[in-house]
Swiss-Prot record:
Purpose: Sterol 14alpha-demethylase that plays a critical role in the cholesterol biosynthesis pathway, being cholesterol the major sterol component in mammalian membranes as well as a precursor for bile acid and steroid hormone synthesis.
UniProt gene name: Cyp51a1
Keyword line: Cholesterol biosynthesis, Cholesterol metabolism, Endoplasmic reticulum, Heme, Iron, Lipid biosynthesis, Lipid metabolism, Membrane, Metal-binding, Microsome, Monooxygenase, Oxidoreductase, Steroid biosynthesis, Steroid metabolism, Sterol biosynthesis, Sterol metabolism, Transmembrane, Transmembrane helix, Ubl conjugation
Record field: catalytic activity: a 14alpha-methyl steroid + 3 reduced [NADPH--hemoprotein reductase] + 3 O2 = a Delta(14) steroid + formate + 3 oxidized [NADPH--hemoprotein reductase] + 4 H2O + 4 H(+); lanosterol + 3 reduced [NADPH--hemoprotein reductase] + 3 O2 = 4,4-dimethyl-5alpha-cholesta-8,14,24-trien-3beta-ol + formate + 3 oxidized [NADPH--hemoprotein reductase] + 4 H2O + 4 H(+); 24,25-dihydrolanosterol + 3 reduced [NADPH--hemoprotein reductase] + 3 O2 = 4,4-dimethyl-8,14-cholestadien-3beta-ol + formate + 3 oxidized [NADPH--hemoprotein reductase] + 4 H2O + 4 H(+); a 14alpha-methyl steroid + reduced [NADPH--hemoprotein reductase] + O2 = a 14alpha-hydroxymethyl steroid + oxidized [NADPH--hemoprotein reductase] + H2O + H(+)
Sequence positions that bind heme: 449
UniProt-annotated location(s): Endoplasmic reticulum membrane; Microsome membrane
Gene Ontology molecular function: heme binding; iron ion binding; sterol 14-demethylase activity
Record text on activity regulation: Inhibited by azalanstat. Inhibited by azole antifungal agents ketoconazole, itraconazole and fluconazole.
Name of this protein: Lanosterol 14-alpha demethylase
Family indicated by similarity: Belongs to the cytochrome P450 family.
Any Pfam family hit: p450
Lineage of the species this protein comes from: Eukaryota, Metazoa, Chordata, Craniata, Vertebrata
EC code: 1.14.14.154
Primary location: endoplasmic reticulum
């Protein structure tokens, strides 16, 4: 579950954020403006400090000129990032650089160029310097990008060991039960914000499966709001501004972090004292040790549980919502997915099992195609620490080195009928099987998302339940545009129409 995307519009985003968080309060606005100015000075000094001489004979990537000091291409990129990158690819090729808010970003587009980022060592292209300031206030100290990369890799390995087939077989009936109970309130027909609904359901199912019944039992409206406040820490402002600023969203994030940690601490202590066997990630973390034999602390366990929930929630809820609109737009495909349920599981549609879920190949391809056209994360980034050579160019230290799954997964050079939603493209030879980094919605290399398989289990189980219960339609033909102002690229106004299937 790759967590985060790229700051897309420096000045515009800050203006929007200031207007929202201050409510027009002059003092608050001035404080934020001062803090932002200090941040700009810091970024400028940082950028200057990163100016290094390239090795003799080395050639820099093509640089897209901007007459606007400091902000550079931030506004143009923020308005239409995909169009900006695709136009740059056509003009400059697979490797190019440009400036935004005082930083230089070098994009690697296409499978061959992207290999540099995904095959890199952390000491050459560093992730902590990019993502640490965002994740640490949300997850806490001692986990993810707050620790040396070797420790983070151990933590990911521990989590991955708990996301296994034996656990998945137990999770499917849990997720199905949660989904059926959730949809009881929908009635026979209506219109719903499907992204909001699926976000709620995915929090419920993920908490039950990963955190265990102790934590799931406490997931009421108050705790759900705490999760929302914590999730509110993943913003462009949080990426740009110091974490200690007294912004309302930062204060809500920090308060939610403390309260959720306290809930987790109590659940951890209760589990340690319990003699009942449990099959969830919480138990996996309690039973695991690092290579040196040290057990995980309660602080580390709670931080990893928060990270698992929020990172997975973003990927699964966004993908699930987008797939709903693709299926609503293509009613014959939606009907094929429903008939697949009967063909694989039985005409009377008995409770789902993991083995049946594996055989829902069309539904699987629909998820895969949704992730191709609407990957949750538009950009994956690293900080260049050493000179890096790719496609005949040398990227100097200090550049933000980026790969865009969204662009790679719709390049004209790689994908036939690239903008069409066609799940059957995966039945033939395609770039996803032939080009190693043409299809990377979950990342690749050492930072590949460890929750990919769980995400598929979760989404397939939820959508199997939804297809069995309802038919879905667009409202007056409306298909959402992409909201590029958020760090996770959600659908705009994602309201969908539904009607219960006749028995």
């Amino acid at each position: 579950m790759v967590l985060l995307g790229l700051l897309q519009s420096g000045g515009w985003v800050l203006g929007q954020a200031m207007e929202q968080v201050t409510g027009g309060n002059l003092l608050s606005t001035l404080l934020i403006a001062c803090a932002f100015t200090l941040s700009l000075v810091y970024l400028f000094r940082l950028a200057v400090g990163h100016m290094v001489q390239l090795p003799a004979g080395a050639k820099s990537p093509p640089h897209i000129y901007s007459p606007i000091p400091f902000l550079g291409h931030a506004i143009a990129f923020g308005k239409s990032p995909i169009e900006f990158l695709e136009n740059a690819y056509e003009k400059y090729g697979p490797v190019f650089s440009f400036t935004m808010v005082g930083k230089t970003f070098t994009y690697l587009l296409g499978s061959d160029a992207a290999a540099l980022l995904f095959n890199s060592k952390n000491e050459d292209l560093n992730a902590e310097e990019v993502y640490g300031r965002l994740t640490t206030p949300v997850f806490g100290k001692g986990v993810a990008y707050d620790v040396p990369n070797a420790i983070f890799l151990e933590q990911k390995k521990i989590i991955k060991s708990g996301l296994n087939i034996a656990h998945f077989k137990q999770y499917v009936p849990i997720i199905e039960k949660e989904a059926k109970e959730y949809f009881q309130s929908w009635g026979e027909s209506g219109e719903r914000n499907v992204f909001e609904a699926l976000s709620e359901l995915i929090i419920l199912t993920a908490s039950h499966c990963l955190h265990g019944k102790e934590i799931r039992s406490q997931l009421n409206e108050k705790v759900a709001q705490l999760y929302a406040d914590l999730d509110g820490g993943f913003t462009h402002a949080a990426w740009l501004l110091p974490a200690w600023l007294p912004l309302p969203s930062f204060r809500r994030r920090d308060r939610a972090h403390r309260e959720i940690k306290n809930i987790f601490y109590k659940a951890i202590q209760k589990r340690r004292l319990s003699k009942e066997p449990a099959e969830d990630i919480l138990q996996t973390l309690l039973d695991s040790t690092y290579k040196d034999g040290r057990p995980l602390t309660d602080e580390e366990i709670s931080g990893m549980l928060i990270g698992l929930l929020l990172a997975g929630q973003h990927t699964s809820s966004t993908t699930s919502a987008w797939m709903g609109f693709f299926l609503a737009k293509d009613k014959p495909l939606q009907e094929k997915c429903y008939l697949e349920q009967k063909a694989v599981c039985g005409e009377d549609l008995p409770p789902l099992t993991y083995d049946q879920l594996k055989d829902l190949n069309l539904l699987d391809r629909c998820i895969k195609e949704t992730l191709r056209l609407r990957p949750p994360i538009m950009t994956m980034m690293r900080m260049a620490k050493t000179p890096q050579t790719v496609a005949g160019y040398t990227i100097p230290p200090g550049h933000q080195v980026c790969v865009s799954p969204t662009v790679n997964q719709r390049l004209k050079d790689s994908w036939a009928e690239r903008l069409d939603f066609n799940p059957d493209r995966y039945l033939q030879d395609n770039p996803a099987s032939g080009e190693k980094f043409a299809y990377v919605p979950f990342g690749a290399g050492r930072h590949r998302c460890v929750g990919e398989n769980f995400a598929y289990v979760q989404i397939k189980t939820i959508w199997s339940t939804m297809l069995r219960l309802y038919e879905f339609d667009l409202i007056n033909g409306y298909f959402p545009t992409v909201n590029y102002t958020t760090m996770i690229h959600t659908p705009e106004n994602p309201v969908i129409r539904y009607k219960r299937r006749s028995k």
